[in-house]
Amino acid sequence: MKEAGQMQNLESARAGRSVSTQTGSMTGQIPRLSKVNLFTLLSLWMELFPAEAQRQKSQKNEEGKHGPLGDNEERTRVSTDKRQVKRTGLVVVKNMKIVGLHCSSEDLHAGQIALIKHGSRLKNCDLYFSRKPCSACLKMIVNAGVNRISYWPADPEISLLTEASSSEDAKLDAKAVERLKSNSRAHVCVLLQPLVCYMVQFVEETSYKCDFIQKITKTLPDANTDFYYECKQERIKEYEMLFLVSNEEMHKQILMTIGLENLCENPYFSNLRQNMKDLILLLATVASSVPNFKHFGFYRSNPEQINEIHNQSLPQEIARHCMVQARLLAYRTEDHKTGVGAVIWAEGKSRSCDGTGAMYFVGCGYNAFPVGSEYADFPHMDDKQKDREIRKFRYIIHAEQNALTFRCQEIKPEERSMIFVTKCPCDECVPLIKGAGIKQIYAGDVDVGKKKADISYMRFGELEGVSKFTWQLNPSGAYGLEQNEPERRENGVLRPVPQKEEQHQDKKLRLGIH
């Protein structure tokens, strides 16, 4: 047992050394999220990728196959199978760079989607799953020659918790997974690292101070300032129910079934559960920083041009989801003052097999110093330093620049491509974004039009040829219709909000949950 714990700690330490920073050796004055934990959190977050439209489409197809009533026995069997197979998020990593963000669809598991999307390019990749993959996925992934498979140590993809799993099929699948694991070259493991000291506190403080929350408080100064904390508590409850096993004995039983019996004894078990809870708290905190807040979202300031496909906004829940991806990336920053994250997605001409629908991942990045540099190679001072020669601004690579540099897909001019940035793009990045052919920018607008000592944000407001969607109240006047006929904008079209969504027990701000 002691050796097992030492091996786990050794594996965690190795992973920490290999992915601690972009530069490989730099340790800043602020806490940073390790790459292992970043990939883990992104896999959990991808499991939550909005799929309402896909479910509606599936329901219509189901009625088309079986008629309005359908074959009850067949529909019951399909429903039972789907309850047993848990939706799963997946992050594909190559050379410590993200090359794919995926989630399960109605028809395919996350691992199967990765095989379809990446094929033989999966060789030597690391895969981070939000649940332990099933044998059907694992056999193909292992066959592709992946390097390492990491998973979240709770209920696996073939659920061991649901009533549907009582047929023993889930246990048989777990045994098959263990046999595949034992006889493959790929390292199948749990990579969870304890968060660095003060990381949770730092994330809480910076999330509340981020552009999106501050825009709400400045726009509505009389509003209840507790809305952010109320939203966070709701998210924590939701994510703990989804990603944790509340009953400790049941959790131990699952761990033993999926081959992690070495983690069932203390202190390993208690440490594991604490690390999992800390990561869920961090995810809920970051997700709450881009809240599903009534009448706030990413809108064009001049919404009159919404006819062309490149000018149409994404559904708000998808835009928020992608912005939270960027917010998570920002906690890998090497800038002591301001963390910025950016993620690029594109939308194909038709829906694909992925749970993300027609959307596919292009690239991502955060602000950092050049790859391979050491901590003392470049200045780290901001504009408070009078000597301009030892300021950081001429040396740091911006998040948008890293996302463009390390993109894994080409940006196609005929498709709608979009970049999500946690802060307004500066004058250095705006022409790069336009020149790359990106059609849409989603960002905060707190700094628009400002000119600071070493960085300015003048070009964003003047940018033409790229649709800009900034975090703001719906400019079409939906907020003023609150007492009459509430509406919300989706894909550039105002749609009525169901009456039941309007009820909110004496709260000045209403927040929703994904």
Swiss-Prot record:
Domain (CMP/dCMP-type deaminase): residue spans on this chain: 70-168, 317-482
Expression by tissue: Widely expressed. Expressed at high levels in the testis.
Keyword RNA-binding assigned: no
Regions crossing the membrane: none
Xref: PANTHER family: CYTIDINE AND DCMP DEAMINASE DOMAIN-CONTAINING PROTEIN 1, DEOXYCYTIDYLATE DEAMINASE-RELATED
Family the UniProt entry places it in: Belongs to the cytidine and deoxycytidylate deaminase family.
Name of the protein in question: Cytidine and dCMP deaminase domain-containing protein 1
Organism of this sequence: Homo sapiens
